[in-house]
Amino acid sequence: MSSGNISNLPARRPFMRRRKVCPFSGENAPAIDFKDPKLLLRYMSERGKIVPSRITAVSAKKQRELARAIKRARQLALLPYVVD
């Protein structure tokens, strides 16, 4: 293939990434509560660390609430600090 012959290649469409929406905003969104370990475990890694908001698409305000709830649940032994 010659290096100067690019005119006959099909044009690529740019990849449009879908905007993520915060799962805690909206009318029927779940409330962040430290007494709900099932909900909080969805936002923790398999090693027990809090997953960052750029991965979970949680807004900054709700990420702070989520981190606070996870830390409270850890203190009350509802969630583990680390998982081996």
Curated annotation (Swiss-Prot):
It comes from the Bacteria. Keywords: Ribonucleoprotein, Ribosomal protein, RNA-binding, rRNA-binding. The keyword Ribonucleoprotein applies. One of its GO terms (molecular function) is small ribosomal subunit rRNA binding. Gene3D superfamilies: Ribosomal protein S18. One of its GO terms (cellular component) is cytosolic small ribosomal subunit. Coiled coil: none annotated. The keyword Glycosyltransferase does not apply. GO terms for biological process: translation. Belongs to the bacterial ribosomal protein bS18 family. Binds as a heterodimer with protein bS6 to the central domain of the 16S rRNA, where it helps stabilize the platform of the 30S subunit. Part of the 30S ribosomal subunit. Forms a tight heterodimer with protein bS6. This is Small ribosomal subunit protein bS18. It comes from Maricaulis maris (strain MCS10) (Caulobacter maris).
